[in-house]
Amino acid sequence: MRKWNYQEALAQFFTSPVQSNAPEEHLVISREKSVIAQVLRKYKNPSFKLQSPLNVQFLSSNALELGVDAGGPTTAYFFYLMQDLMRGSFNGIQLFQGEAGHLVPSVDYDLVSSCFFGIVGKMIVHSFLHQCRGLAGLSPAIISYIISGTRDTVLEYLVVDDVPDPCLREILNEVKV
């Protein structure tokens, strides 16, 4: 399998976002459970097509909610998924640290070595492809890194507020003055 760089991957996705003639991907989401835990296997599966139309249904109290996915359930699904990613409500694992607007990925060997952030990236791209807003609250330095793929561009966006540890942030602010 050919490995693309980020520019080729984005160009591929955005030249043909959602392919309306492709078979639908069906998702049934329980409102009582973590959304990440319910869809993780889908995103790990290479046959899961991000560009296929989605048909999302929600379960409440073990009963399917009535309705047709004309866009509302899909938007709600991505809203809840991005909320779970920001809160880190996946088996108690905190995926991002810091405050809103300055969130940075957690430094966790298991998350990095298992390529979990690659799956998180697929979830975010999937959200964009379906005209949803993606993951809000990331540090501008992290966004710069995602876009450029190089650490050099991060420095111009890096600020003390990007340090997730409040004690260390306070010390850095004292040194800065």
For each feature predicted by the language model, list its residue ranges.
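Long, Ser/Thr/Pro/Gly-rich and/or acidic low-complexity regions in intracellular
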Residues: 1-177
